[in-house]
């Protein structure tokens, strides 16, 4: 049975996508910093409240620089106060069964300590330290996603990814690759095994009571590019191992030149399994997010 499309919360964009995004797939939204990716992602996540019964979850991979302003955008655009999951030294995996403890809208696994995201920029000891830090936080990251999924969340937005020359050089892409294949796309009971480990048998009945279909969970990856102009994004080649090669849908946001004026426009470069518009769609950034002309 065909599942209803996931609305982006932007009618003009839904029309360009043939009715919306296909549930259970990965969408990459690509564009330079400041072009409107985060606002599009926040709108998409919030639309889950009306369509799925639960708002989506935003996973922030920022490790340096300023915040992506997700909380401010959510409050201003949607009147939505993001519930942030707090990462602590110790936690009880069984807390995922409590909506009050498990439901969150914003996960930020790493502090903004100025750590560079490119593996080649790290000293060997820094890379080893990072991997150890990642393993310490991985259980709580899995609990953050699983605790949302068992309570009805079906949309995930990944933000805060810095541009690199090669995706394989960035630990952010390595982490996303793990999360997408080993968390978002994993059967619910196998993900529960990863979380509860030796205690899985004692939790198995609750795991089955909270079963969900991982094929209904969609991911939106906000990809910061070096390219600023939409024309350059459209002509950008897809490299071997590039995240774009595995995405079901690619949405490009970039600057366009119109005489003496520079504006913004969107183009759906790929939408596998669906009809989509071939138009370049001009838009503006307003208080409520992306406004199409």
Q: What do the predicted segments below correspond to?
A:
Residues 164-175, 187:
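Conserved ATPase-coupling elements of RecA-like P-loop NTPase cores
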Residues 7-21:
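Pre-Walker A adenine-sensing motif
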Residues 188, 192-289:
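Phosphate-binding/switch region of NTP-binding enzymes
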Residues 35, 162-168, 228-231:
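Short acidic, S/G/P-rich loop/turn micro-motifs used as interaction or catalytic elements
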Residues 20-92:
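Walker A/P-loop NTP-binding active-site region of P-loop NTPases
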Residues 171-178, 235-241:
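Charged helix-capping and loop-helix junction motifs
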Residues 60-165:
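Conserved inter-motif catalytic segment of the P-loop NTP-binding fold
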Residues 23, 130-134, 277-293:
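NTP-binding/hydrolysis catalytic cores, primarily Walker-type P-loop NTPases
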């Amino acid at each position: 049975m065909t599942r209803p499309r996931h609305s982006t919360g932007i009618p003009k964009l839904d029309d360009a996508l043939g009715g919306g995004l296909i549930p259970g797939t990965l969408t990459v939204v690509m564009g330079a910093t400041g072009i409107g990716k985060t606002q599009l992602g926040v709108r998409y996540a919030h639309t889950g409240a009306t369509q799925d019964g639960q708002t989506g979850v935003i996973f922030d991979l920022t490790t340096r620089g300023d915040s992506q302003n997700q909380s401010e955008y959510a409050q201003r655009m949607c009147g939505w106060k993001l519930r942030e999951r707090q990462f602590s030294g110790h936690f009880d995996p069984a807390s995922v069964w409590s909506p009050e403890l498990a439901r969150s809208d914003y996960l930020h696994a790493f502090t903004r300590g100025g750590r560079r995201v490119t593996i080649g920029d790290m000293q060997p000891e820094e890379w080893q330290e990072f991997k150890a830090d990642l393993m310490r936080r991985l259980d709580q990251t899995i609990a953050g996603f699983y605790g949302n999924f068992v309570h009805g969340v079906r949309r995930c937005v990944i933000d805060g990814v810095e541009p690199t020359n090669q995706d394989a050089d960035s630990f952010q892409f390595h982490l996303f690759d793990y999360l997408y294949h080993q968390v978002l796309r994993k059967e619910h009971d196998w993900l529960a095994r990863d979380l509860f480990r030796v205690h899985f048998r004692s939790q198995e009945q609750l795991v089955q009571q909270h079963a969900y279909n991982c094929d209904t969970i969609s991911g939106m990856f906000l990809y910061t590019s070096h390219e600023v102009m939409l024309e350059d994004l459209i002509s950008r080649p897809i490299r071997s191992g590039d995240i774009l090669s595995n995405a079901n849908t690619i949405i490009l946001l970039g600057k366009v030149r119109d005489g003496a004026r520079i504006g913004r426009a969107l183009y759906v470069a790929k939408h596998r399994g669906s009809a989509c518009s071939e138009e370049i769609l001009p838009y503006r950034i307003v208080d409520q997010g992306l406004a199409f002309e």
